[in-house]
């Protein structure tokens, strides 16, 4: 019997999904007031995954009270054997923001925190189980505050051997992994309407996370510890957490956090559980 030829990759592929996190944490800082956040994402890939465009939405609870965070992204992903690059640009949009006002109408926040960021990410597949990465993100107008923001980080992800979980049914013993990130956010002086355009230094800070993930087909469960070296006072100066105006200028948005998440994702390249009879019900059989 002749070998059936593999179908060519589609010219345009798609990936989409949704996620729930017990706290939306962005580089160590809560964006949802330490509460849960529903999220969604969509990406189109072109020319076998070489180029992409995408969007994402995040439920937020921020001082300027936007309806959500809405992100747009575009870039390229060239690969060189075990090394892969992701070079792109992101735009963070916060629709229908409202300026937070204090007594007498004093400005406590800016009216617009939208900003653009340029990204360069590299990953190296050291072994079948270990992947290492380096990331650099740069914004010339971080949070619309006329400040430069540069975030650099290193990442590591390791797939745990399936035989470590031999007490589980064979179909579920694989898919466990641990991963971590260590980064530093370099921030310069900002000028905003809240300070009368007088420059003030945003606090640069160290950030790290480490977590355990479990992947079953298109479903990912993750529990992760996050922390920064920002003090509660620096956290307030950085975030403008509205409660800080009444508690002596402090915020808890940047401290220790253990966050859980569940993600559902599918794509035209790997439809996985969504393409099987019974769909998500297969998880419970």
Question: Which residues fall in each region the model found?
Answer:
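Outer-membrane beta-barrel biogenesis signature
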Residues: 1-15, 26-31, 158-173, 269-285
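Residues that define the transmembrane beta-barrel architecture of outer-membrane proteins
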Residues: 10-12, 34-38, 66-70, 83, ...
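Membrane-embedded beta-strand positions of outer-membrane beta-barrel proteins
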Residues: 16-18, 42, 51-55, 74, ...
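Transmembrane beta-strands of outer-membrane beta-barrel pores
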Residues: 20-26, 46-48, 55-61, 78-80, ...
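Outer-membrane beta-barrel translocator domains and adjoining extracellular loop/strand segments
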Residues: 26-33, 63-70, 97-109, 143-149, ...
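Repeated loop/turn-to-beta-strand initiation elements of outer-membrane beta-barrel proteins
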Residues: 48-53, 82-87, 128-134, 162-168, ...
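Outer-membrane beta-barrel "beta-signal"
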Residues: 154-160, 214-216, 250-285
């Amino acid at each position: 019997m002749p070998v059936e030829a593999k179908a060519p990759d589609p010219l345009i592929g798609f990936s989409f999904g949704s996620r729930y996190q017990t706290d939306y944490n962005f580089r160590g800082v809560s964006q949802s007031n330490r509460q849960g956040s529903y999220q969604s994402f969509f990406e189109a890939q072109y020319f076998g995954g070489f180029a992409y465009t995408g969007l994402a939405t995040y439920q937020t609870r921020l001082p300027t009270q936007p309806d959500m965070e809405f992100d747009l992204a575009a870039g390229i992903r060239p690969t060189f054997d075990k090394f892969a690059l992701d070079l792109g640009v992101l735009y963070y949009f916060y629709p229908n923001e409202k300026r937070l006002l204090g007594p007498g109408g004093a400005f406590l926040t800016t009216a617009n925190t939208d900003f653009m960021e340029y990204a360069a990410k590299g990953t190296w597949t050291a072994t079948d189980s270990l992947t290492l990465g380096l990331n650099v993100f740069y914004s010339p107008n971080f949070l619309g505050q006329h400040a430069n923001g540069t975030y650099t980080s290193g990442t590591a992800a390791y797939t745990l051997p399936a035989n470590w979980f031999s007490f589980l049914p064979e179909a579920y013993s694989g898919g466990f992994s641990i991963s971590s990130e260590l980064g530093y956010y370099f921030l310069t002086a900002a000028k905003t309407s809240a300070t009368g355009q007088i420059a003030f230094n945003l606090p640069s800070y160290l950030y790290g996370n480490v977590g355990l993930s479990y992947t079953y087909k298109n479903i990912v469960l993750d529990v992760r510890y996050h922390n920064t070296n920002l003090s509660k006072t620096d956290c307030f100066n950085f975030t403008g957490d509205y409660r800080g105006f009444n508690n002596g200028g402090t915020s808890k948005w940047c401290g220790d956090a253990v966050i859980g998440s569940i993600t559902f994702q599918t794509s035209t390249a790997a439809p996985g559980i969504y393409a099987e009879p019974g769909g998500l019900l297969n998880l419970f059989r």
